[in-house]
Amino acid sequence: MIDHIILTVSNVEHSLAFYEAALAPLDIKFFMPYKGENGHPDLWGVGNGKSAFFWLKHGKPDPRAIHWGFMAQNNAKVDEFYQAAIAAGAKVNISPRARMEYYSGYYAADVFDPDGYSFEVVHKS
């Protein structure tokens, strides 16, 4: 099980605003800043209000290097995420739909963030 992800972004403030808006339907929001010490970079944590599991740091992004998915409670939350992400400036990768190529209970939407990273929100039933 994954505990956290650190994503390098070109503009932390812009990316933080994007992810807060796009992930609002999943109740994921900015949680805390972490001032790096002893060579550790400054991080901005996004999470569920109890802990941060998705961190942003400033640097040179490499969108080819990673893809990830957030879990949704149901298909409607996937659809809400998609609308929120597009409204926040995401570019379409794959619109919400059943992904029968994976298996019958896989429903997801996939977008590109401001730095070109591909990520999805998925409901598995």
Indicate where each model-derived feature is located:
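Short amphipathic alpha-helices in soluble, non-transmembrane regions
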Residues: F18-A21, F81-A85
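Core segments of cupin and vicinal oxygen chelate
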Residues: I6-S51
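Alpha-helical elements of the RecA-like P-loop NTPase motor core of helicases
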Residues: L16-A17, D79, F119
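Short acidic/glycine-enriched loop/turn segments that link adjacent beta-strands
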Residues: E37-H40, D62, Y102-G105
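Active-site/binding-pocket entry motifs
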Residues: S51-A52, D62
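Vicinal oxygen chelate
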Residues: D3-N11, K60-A84, A87-S125
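Eukaryotic scaffold repeat domains enriched in small/polar residues
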Residues: W55-L56
